[in-house]
């Protein structure tokens, strides 16, 4: 039989006996992950710096003055308009009227072309 039909074993690797042994590194094969030590160090440094930043943020909270909220500052009755009474129905009608005016303006801009 020819050598091309044989199973590939470590001892029977045709690429290892080839004149160009560098060809063994090319093409498909088992992927070997190279560990890059410098990347690991950078990750550790970034984790440490994140932890330091979080500690600094916690220190900032300690400087603020957290006094209890006075009940005199709380608005009762849901009033958020500084005493002005708003008629919501009137406001809705005004918005509808404005939309109608816009539609009429659009009709005036359109001029049919005569062919």
Swiss-Prot record:
Pfam families: CHZ
Regions of compositional bias (Basic and acidic residues) in chain numbering: 23-33
Main location: nucleus
Compartments (UniProt record): Nucleus
UniProt KW keywords: Chaperone, Nucleus
Stretches for region Disordered: 1-115
Record's compositionally biased regions (Acidic residues): 34-64, 98-109
InterPro entries linked to this entry: Histone_chaperone_domain_CHZ
Stretches with biased composition (Polar residues): 1-11
Gene Ontology terms: cellular component: nucleus
Low complexity bias locations: 13-22
Membrane-crossing segments per the record: none
Subunit comment: Forms a heterotrimer with H2A.Z-H2B, stabilizing the association of the histone dimer. Also, with a lower affinity, forms a heterotrimer with H2A-H2B.
Protein family: Belongs to the CHZ1 family.
Function comment: Forms a chaperone-bound H2A.Z-H2B complex that acts as a source for SWR1 complex-dependent H2A to H2A.Z histone replacement in chromatin.
This protein's name: Histone H2A.Z-specific chaperone chz1
Organism: Emericella nidulans (strain FGSC A4 / ATCC 38163 / CBS 112.46 / NRRL 194 / M139)
């Amino acid at each position: 039989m020819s050598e091309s039909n044989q199973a590939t074993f470590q001892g029977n690797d045709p690429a290892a006996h080839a004149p160009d042994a560098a060809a063994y590194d090319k093409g498909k094969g088992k992927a070997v992950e190279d560990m890059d030590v410098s990347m690991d160090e950078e990750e550790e440094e970034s984790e440490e710096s994140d932890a330091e930043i979080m500690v600094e943020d916690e220190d900032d909270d300690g400087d603020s003055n957290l006094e209890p909220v006075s009940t005199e500052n709380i608005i009762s009755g849901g009033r958020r308009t500084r005493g002005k009474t708003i008629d919501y129905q009137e406001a809705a009608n005004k918005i509808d009227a404005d939309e109608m005016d816009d539609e009429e303006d659009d009709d005036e801009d359109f001029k049919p072309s005569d062919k």
